[in-house]
């Protein structure tokens, strides 16, 4: 299988963050999706949330602040170039660009993962807003079996 680039592969989400589909769910025969995220400083998935699939993130440039539930408690740290973060299904997590330049990560998940980001890009075009963004993207989270949660 060889994936080729085209304009519909790059999406804007939660402001000026970008995700580029490298291998779509259909290109993998419905097995997985691979994407590149470009997360702006303090941008990203700022709301603590859970989902029902495993996600893998590999930092290829920059830094991201991660919060991830491990053994029932929340750990927060900075992931840097070369670090890989594995988010177990059902674990509370969030991430945001850290530092003063964008963070680039390769991420792997199921085909629904790509579909979620496409729906998220359609639902919210502006920067993250603590009051309005959750209301706008809440139905997208519900559709994909995800939940925004408290710490």
State where each predicted segment sits.
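Short histidine-centered beta-strand/loop micro-motifs
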Residues: 23-24, 44-51, 68, 75-78, ...
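A short glycine-rich, His/Asp/Glu-containing loop-to-beta-strand
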Residues: 9-48, 53-54
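Glycine- and acidic-residue-biased ligand/ion/polar-headgroup-sensing regions
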Residues: 52-65, 69-70, 81
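Ligand-binding loop in jelly-roll beta-barrel domains
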Residues: 81, 89-114
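Acidic/histidine-enriched, glycine/proline-rich intrinsically disordered or flexible terminal extensions
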Residues: 119-151
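Short acidic-glycine-tyrosine-enriched beta hairpin
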Residues: 70-92
